[in-house]
Amino acid sequence: MLVIGNGRMITQDASNPFLENGAVAMDGNTIVMVGVTEEVKKAYPDAEFIDAKGEVIMPAFINAHEHIYSSFARGLSINGYNPQGFLDILDGLWWTVDRHLTLEQTKLSAYATYIDSIKNGVTTVFDHHASFGHITGSLNAIEEAAKDLGVRTCLCFEISDRDGMEKSRESVMENVNFIKHALADDSDMIAGMMGMHASFTISDETMALCNELKPEGVGYHIHVAEGIYDLHQCLKEHGKRIVDRLHDWNILGPKTLLGHCIYVNEHEMDLIKDTDTMVVHNPESNMGNACGCPPTMRMVQKGILTGLGTDGYTHDMMESWKVANVLHKHSLCDPNAAWGEVPQMLFEGNAEIANRYFKKQLGVLKEGAAADVIVIDYDPLTPMNESNINGHLMFGVNGSMVQTTVCNGKVLMKDREVLVCDEAKVMADCRQAAKELADDING
């Protein structure tokens, strides 16, 4: 038994959203009680007690779109790389990195990403992986890191024809085999999806193969209209817009997650809504790649299940929230834009996305939900109550303020110390791997 208490508790449970002095009791991987600290301690007097000391207690974060393979690109300088557009960024940086990754480097990239996620209070990660130099076994390598560190993750490999049809088919089989493996795993900590890069790198032949081989019970995770070229190519080669093409290939549906969706129109948004397909917004990436601003506020208004991701730019979901907030205010010239929509995406949207792949309820502190809890070092200087929670979180909190992270009832980090690995040793291994990757890329 574990109790975390003596903190300002944000539950994300509409029936009991805020407790001035709250506590959460966990038995194994399940929350068994949420209430006033004194009452919870009285109910479970023998439980291990973590004193939040007035700090904020809340559900752990969920990242709905991550790229583990990008971990070692931080600070990477590639000879001759001078991108003039998004396609140059893809080919000159990201596809170059993924073609050179070894299985060991992929695994260490996963350790680096998951450790940083833990330190930012993220315990559930939807990753979209690519390592076309070493495809087979790459998802299992990532899974090993996730299980070792105790985080929950949903994995896929981005299917693409960009490196030829042999590797394309291998990437299809990597997804198929991992999905079957994940479906047989009863831990509720691992899930799989059919990953796809984007419409413009996937032929009809490969679409048909995916349709034929995809196991039942899962959907797709694909970048959609991230850059304008994706749309132009689809119109030219297929005579239709991207979402229409995906719909025609039975890609859309409640288990499918579409990344970005920058260049989609009203008709496409209606298709996404009508098929109950999920969308994930990645604001920093869209801005950093100069791709544009998606009509995310319109999607939320239409009732499309929309979540928030980082696309590998950061592992701090609070940072992604802050950027999304100012991006849409700026883009729409509306000071009210994104105020309610973005926290809805981060908390309600990401939780619903995760709950389509994991059995236990995530993203909320309530009886029966998953024991995924964080403590944040935030002692507000202004009044805090259920009516102004989001204002405090957005303007007062960042990921580095997370002190304690619990996932599935296991304490992964306490008082900023990662407990589930020798962080210094892992980071030393990662630094060496990053150097070897950079040397290999630059010849």
Where are these regions (language model features)?
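Active-site microenvironment of metallo-dependent hydrolases
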Residues: 1-22, 26-32, 37, 42-43, ...
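Divalent metal-coordination and catalytic microenvironments
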Residues: 7, 24, 29, 54, ...
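Alpha-helical scaffold segments that flank or form the walls of functional sites
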Residues: 57, 76-128, 133-151, 173-185, ...
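Active-site gating loops and adjacent loop-to-helix segments of metal-dependent hydrolytic enzymes
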Residues: 72-106, 162-164, 228-255, 275-278, ...
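Metal-coordinating catalytic core of metallo-dependent amide/deamination hydrolases
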Residues: 129-262
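Glycine-enriched alpha-helix->loop->beta-strand junction motifs that scaffold or abut catalytic
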Residues: 150, 214-219, 251-254, 271-280, ...
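His/Asp/Glu-enriched, well-ordered alpha-helical/loop segment
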Residues: 248-251, 255, 297-380, 394-398
